From Swiss-Prot:
Annotated gene: atpB
The name this protein goes by in its record: ATP synthase subunit a
Organism: Synechococcus sp. (strain CC9605)
Alphabetical list of InterPro entries matching this protein: ATP_syn_F0_a_bact/chloroplast, ATP_synth_F0_asu, ATP_synth_F0_asu_AS, F0_ATP_A_sf
Entry keyword Ion transport: yes
Transmembrane segments: 30-50, 89-109, 128-148, 193-213, 214-234
Localization terms from the record: Cellular thylakoid membrane
Classification via NCBIfam families: ATP_synt_6_or_A
Record family assignment: Belongs to the ATPase A chain family.
PANTHER family hit by this protein: ATP SYNTHASE SUBUNIT A, CHLOROPLASTIC
Ion transport listed as a keyword: yes
Length: 241
């Protein structure tokens, strides 16, 4: 007796279909740009509303924004140091807020209401292009911080405490952006796929605990990325001991 193939609902889940914009010979990932612009617009709107008519004793949205500001300031100060953290606070804050809003937006915003010719919108951080770009920005910030502070003496850290460490230090510079980008990308993509499969299989109650866990891990991933970014910048600024 031949077995008939059963149309499993989760077979509709596909990865790999994307919307591309062509500018000359350059192809841009349109889905990432669109979702990023939407989330940045939401973030800017929240900030503008929360900072309008600020009071000495904050309440409501202003209170939340001041809490986030103090939280990000502590991350930067603890890892970069009291002397230099103010210069890097906008960079660290931008990374944290963009990743946090992207992760939560990917889980909470009903992206399917936006119809595209191909593919669908989702969390920008679930795309490897976004996470690699941010990781490379952190690497550039690390080198800029070190070279602007120490000049060519910055490269002494590659041969400290002994020149034997040179190849290992060079390998480390490649593993930093790789670990930053793939950790964030893997966690967010896995969460979206897991929730998507569960929604197709049992669309009512079962996916809720997984979604709540995903929101928690998404916030943790934003914290880890911002903490490591500030740590790397602090490492470039301070003298090796």
């Amino acid at each position: 007796m031949a077995l008939l193939p059963l149309p499993l609902p989760f077979a509709e889940l596909e990865v790999g279909h994307h919307l591309y914009w062509q500018i000359g010979d350059l192809y841009l990932h349109g889905q990432v740009f669109l979702s990023s612009w939407i989330l940045i617009g939401i973030l800017l709107a929240v900030v503008l509303v929360g900072t309008r008519g600020m009071k000495r004793d904050p309440i409501g949205l202003q209170n939340l924004l001041e809490f986030l500001w103090n939280f990000i300031r502590d991350i930067a100060r603890d890892n970069i140091g009291e002397k230099y953290y103010r210069d890097w606070l906008p960079f660290i804050g931008t990374l944290f807020l963009f990743i946090f809003v992207s992760n939560w937006g990917g889980a909470l915003i009903p992206w399917k209401i936006f119809e595209l010719p191909e593919g669908e919108l989702g969390a920008p951080t679930a795309d490897i292009n976004t996470t690699v770009a941010m990781a490379l920005l952190v690497s550039l910030a690390y080198f800029y911080a070190g070279l602007s502070r120490k000049g060519l003496r910055f490269f002494e850290l590659y041969v400290e405490p002994t020149p034997i460490m040179l190849p290992f230090k060079i390998i480390e510079e490649f593993t930093k952006p790789l670990s930053l980008s793939f950790r964030l990308f893997g966690n967010i993509l896995a969460d979206e796929l897991a929730v998507g499969v569960l929604v197709y299989l049992v669309p009512l109650i079962v996916p809720l605990p997984v979604m709540l866990l995903g929101l928690f891990t998404s916030a943790i991933q934003a914290l880890i990325f911002a903490t490591l970014a500030s740590f790397y910048i602090g490492e470039g600024l301070h003298e090796a001991h």
